[in-house]
């Protein structure tokens, strides 16, 4: 009995080790089509097209006449049916726009941390006054970039169709006017295969 149990456990261990997962690196720019859900290819495509649209816009030429305008990027609202990390989309767009050399940015997501550090420098008595950052010297944003990511999903059991739409806006903070807006769209489809004998 013990011998049979040991033999069964040995066979089970051998089978379990044969089902191990292989991990490998892939090209981050390669098209990813594992599912119709939002993925890395969608992030790269939407952000790349949107950034190029803003860079090529006559509005960008107009607001850049007196130098690189200062922007802050508000969070992109996820209005899709999926849990999507819109912060990754926001970060990617901000990075690409900054690399373009056409814009400067302030990071509103870190205001509380910056304020805490400045207060520490001013009030703690621990910071050398010669190296202390003075209050009231930060650059203010002139424009706000913000948007929404929405989706429409249709599924009839055989075909699943997913449509994504990213809408972005650039607002002049002085006047409240929209100086630029664009939409980029992606449609993905999956079909269930039927067995053919």
Summary of predicted features, one role per range:
Residues 13-37, 196-197:
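Bacterial Sec signal peptide processing site at the extreme N-terminus
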Residues 20-23, 143-190, 194:
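Amphipathic beta-strand/beta-sheet edge segments enriched in Tyr/Trp
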Residues 25-60:
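N-terminal leader/capping segments at the start of a protein or of a new domain
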Residues 35-46, 65, 81-85, 89, ...:
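Extracytoplasmic/periplasmic, Sec-exported soluble proteins
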Residues 49-54, 70-75, 126-155:
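A short, hydrophobic beta-strand-centered structural micro-motif
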Residues 49-127, 177-181:
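N-terminal segment of the mature soluble domain
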Residues 125, 192-197:
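Short, surface-exposed secondary-structure junctions/capping segments
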